[in-house]
């Protein structure tokens, strides 16, 4: 490999890493949603917390550490739906990005 090929390869690698980072930031931002007067981030942590909370009303801290009274079943359903939708979309875009390399 000559120097020009190495430079092209390193630029392509850098562009791919940057594109993956941007893709991650894009979908992490899409995981945020509002419910019951609070802001929540859909993800395994929230889903697991909600799975362990007993049925009925509960008070949880939202993203801004504000106590919010929620119905755990509703919030868990919304979080799981948002998580699955965004993870599926992220996977599709990630696979498209990987084929462009």
Language-model segments: which ranges?
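A preference for well-ordered globular domain cores
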Residues: 1-101
């Amino acid at each position: 490999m000559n120097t020009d090929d190495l430079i092209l390869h390193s630029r392509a690698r850098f562009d791919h890493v940057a594109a993956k980072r941007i893709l991650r930031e894009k979908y992490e931002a899409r995981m945020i949603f509002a419910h019951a007067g609070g802001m929540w981030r859909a993800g395994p942590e929230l889903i697991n917390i909600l799975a362990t909370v007993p049925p009925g009303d509960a008070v949880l801290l939202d993203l801004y550490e504000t106590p919010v009274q929620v119905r755990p079943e509703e919030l868990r359903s919304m979080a799981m739906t948002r998580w699955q939708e965004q993870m599926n979309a992220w996977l599709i875009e990630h696979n498209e990005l990987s084929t462009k390399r």
